[in-house]
Amino acid sequence: MRTVFSQIPRFKQVNQYIRMSTRQSDISNFFISSASHKSEHVEVSQSSSDSKNVDGRSTSEKRKVESVKLVDESKHNNHDDTGTQNVERENNIVSEAKKQKTLGSSSSSSDAVSSNNDSGASTPIPLPIKEPPLESNARNDKLKGHATFAEMVKAFTKIENTSKRLEIIDIMGTYFFGILRDHPSDLLACVYLSINKLGPDYSGLELGIGESIIMKAIGESTGQTLQQIKLSFHKVGDLGLVAQTSRQNQPTMFKPAALTIPFLFDSLKKIAQMSGNQSQNRKIGVIKRLLSSCEGAEPKYLIRALEGKLRLQLAEKTILVALANATAQYHADKNGEKLSQQDRIEGEQILRDVYCQLPSYDLIVPHLIEHGLGTLRETCKLTPGIPTKPMLAKPTKQISEVLNTFDQAAFTCEYKYDGERAQVHFTEDGKFYVFSRNSENMSVRYPDISVSVSKWKKPDARSFILDCEAVGWDRDENKILPFQKLATRKRKDVKIGDIKVRACLFAFDILYLNGQPLLETPLNERRKLLYSMFQPSTGDFTFAKHSDQKSIESIEEFLEESVKDSCEGLMVKMLEGPDSHYEPSKRSRHWLKVKKDYLSGVGDSLDLIVIGAYYGKGKRTSVYGAFLLGCYDPDTETVQSICKLGTGFSEEHLETFYNQLKDIVISKKKDFYAHSDVPAHQPDVWFEPKYLWEVLAADLSLSPVYKAAIGYVQEDKGISLRFPRFIRIREDKSWEDATTSEQVSEFYRSQVAYSQKEKEGSPAAEDY
């Protein structure tokens, strides 16, 4: 053993040893990551003065393990035929390290490339399952000069040090411009990594990695026990920081090859696609190999990406603006043109509009690289098979507001059905899709809808996109079922023969027909097309019931009728002219929703995230008795507490929720949860953000305890719900689709304005 360590100075001299701290920042001088799945650096303890390691083993014991690790890594690396200088350096060490093989210790599983070593005694940490090589090509990577993760991390670090949105846009715009100029083929992966996604929402690609897997990977990669990692996490509350600190404290002989963007992105996608036997061990293996190539702040952002939260103020709308600015500047420079501020503003609007219609960077980014923003609207249009973002409605507290909003314009009232928003697509080649409001592909969940298409689609409808509500239907009595019945349907692997609750489509809009987008067609014309191309089929498909009303009395009557017909209330929409156009992703005042239950309350229900719970008392001692809920601020990527909820539950509800939530309990509050730090205000347990509940409240009030929309109305106070009541679980939405902080502030302002109007007997100000 002494022989190995006595030779380290000579290895440094002969092999031109380069310290990690001198790593070059110029992207063109970075090493590109290896083609194979193995790490290109060797870990050796460089300190002979330490008497004990952090995991309690003696220095000599640690050196024995690391010596054999060094042998196995070098032996594995001999299979690399790239002939790079790094491999030659490692081969020089192999001959010395092999002399120590007789120690009898087997390689620890913390070795990022030791999975091929089948010999040796067992170690305290089990060896991972052999991992197939990740597909990459080191030689091609080096020739192409791919972008590195280090450059992205530099941009992220700058963003973490500012809260100014314009600065954040400028930082990301500059970063994207550099990628366009130097590595255009990497732009798509860079965009996805910046928004922490692996593909379009409808692709269904999600990492789905829990804290336990990440902790285990960090521990095995850095030579620490799981208990040590848990202890560090409990202290700092950020696994990214734990990984960064652990990696920095890990001695290394050589700097690792730079982690390239394509290699990282492909690795994350492979993790997302892993399933079946031993998939957990395989995921850990990939994470370890990625960590072994990280330096500086890279481990922090890698781990945060795996967790699904970068914790930067990088909302997707910010990325869109930055990407538009970078694209406009790149093509202006390329064509020798000067870019004006007006050009930038127009470019931002073009990209926003196109992305709302066609939310797929897979299709948009290649066009941006090749042609810029000028022809984007003509090329990237609404397309069957790719879900567009749905148009949303504003809530209203009183029917008179409807008449005030629409004034003398023509409008229509439609039933608001109590079901699941469904965007139905039919392509020219006969493919059928059903997408949820958050672009999830629900086709496999609704095979009964798919097989009924021929009953309600007329032959002339060759391709189309419909906006509908999927509603539970009682086929025996031919009537609507409550949403709770529809929610009992399985979400995956649904077979028609096993379906107990059938779904019926209630269509209320058509967005695309036979090759033509209809978004800029007035609603009255879209409705005519809808009625001419489709026909009702009892229990399978029908049209949303509508009535064109003109007075408060007639609207009230239609509202009462909708409630009797098992609906939630009414949707009131502009019927003619440009204001009746369909606006994807926009919550517009040209659509208003009127719900019977909410006319005297907040004006709408809220969809809130379950983030904590309080143990029950009395009859509820065996379950959670109340819950801490929060709204979501997409700009700051924070979940902000809004209320403690303890009413509206049945005993069956509480039992079900306890069994669901106990599996996602976490040891401490997430660092992106905003809630009072006062001990008396803390819940008994905290949860991972996963479940979304619909909640109704009497009204809203300012609060020093709850942090919802803090800073929107008052700098030091948030907004809370008074007398909240549980309505239902929102299985059709992800937790990131929760009611936003901005919406909460709008509800509060509307409430204050309405109160002032009643008190003073004067019209409320438009902008309170």
Curated annotation (Swiss-Prot):
It is found in: Nucleus. The active site is at residue 416. It comes from the Eukaryota. Residues 309-318, 490-492 are annotated as: Interaction with target DNA. The record marks 165, 438, 619, 644 as: Interaction with target DNA. Keywords: ATP-binding, Cell cycle, Cell division, DNA damage, DNA recombination, DNA repair, DNA replication, Ligase, Magnesium, Metal-binding, Nucleotide-binding, Nucleus. DNA ligase that seals nicks in double-stranded DNA during DNA replication, DNA recombination and DNA repair. NCBIfam families: dnl1. This is DNA ligase 1. It comes from Schizosaccharomyces pombe (strain 972 / ATCC 24843) (Fission yeast). The lineage of its organism: Eukaryota, Fungi, Dikarya, Ascomycota, Taphrinomycotina. The gene is cdc17.
